[in-house]
Amino acid sequence: MGSSEKLLTLARGEIGNREMPAGSNRVKYNTEYYGWEVSGRAYPWCCVFLWWLFRRAGAAGLFFGGARTASCSTLMDYAKRNGLFVEGNYRPGDLIFMRFSGSGGPQHIGILEEVRGNTLVTIEGNTSADNDAAGGQVQRRERPLRYVLGAYRPDYEEENVTQQQFDAMM
């Protein structure tokens, strides 16, 4: 199983996890990221959730060069600077940057599970049906392309197979 499928399998297993109490940002992903239990508006965790997934999947080096960030904007800038940013032809495992209103940088991020025409199916941390970018749960969401700014495409191992390795698999 390649890195992107490991991440998606792990993400699927997290669906339904939520912060307690609601609205606190107190969630296991933040606790692991910061090293202690945090709460309050200063600790949004959509990007932290993705950091946690990569770390748990044994692929920490594919997220932000192995470093940490809780900022969607910082991660998008990194992807652009390192040739990992794509706009279109999205694939499962891409990290999708979203903006729901106004102009500017990303407000939210999730991992792409499936493309359905003009809709992307993502798994996201800190979302809900009532609050796109700060909803306090891990959920599978369907996002219209109009919200998508682009994606960070990590350099997954299954995309780096040599011709000899490919022939051996066949």
Model segments located where?
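Positively charged, low-complexity intrinsically disordered regions
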Residues: 27, 69, 141-142
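...with weaker cross-activation on analogous glycine-rich loops/strands in unrelated enzymes
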Residues: 2-8, 59-132
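Intrinsically disordered, low-complexity segments enriched in small/polar residues
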Residues: 27, 31-32, 41, 76, ...
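Aromatic side chains
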Residues: 29, 49-52, 78, 97-100, ...
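N-terminal capping segments
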Residues: 1-62, 155, 163-170
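Active-site signature of cysteine proteases
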Residues: 115-160, 167
